[in-house]
């Protein structure tokens, strides 16, 4: 995945196992999410066996909207309607070909607007924690 992103011209900061660090998925997902929330990275991609754990961990960081995507259309919608900024993937379910499709859809789409009130409600709930 890192090679695919770099081949498409994206600057990639590696965390956890992708950086040859012996770090579990939870702390790695939080580090990625913090980089996105701090605007040190525009977007983040996190992976674990199901994708669920990393999406939960990343979503604990204020300002992060992590979306677990198993196909390109879900990835496209997560960016367009939810302004998701962290992509979570399942290592078990996502083949290399599907990962390429998901990444292309994710990177090719931006927030389309029209969901500002819903996103503001999510942000308000986040602040109320």
Where are these regions (language model features)?
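Mid-chain, well-packed structural core segment of small domains
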Residues: 46-47, 52-92
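Short, structured active-site "lid" loops
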Residues: 27-50
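A short beta-strand-loop structural module common to alpha/beta enzyme folds
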Residues: 11-23
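Short amphipathic alpha-helical segments
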Residues: 1-3, 56-60, 100-101
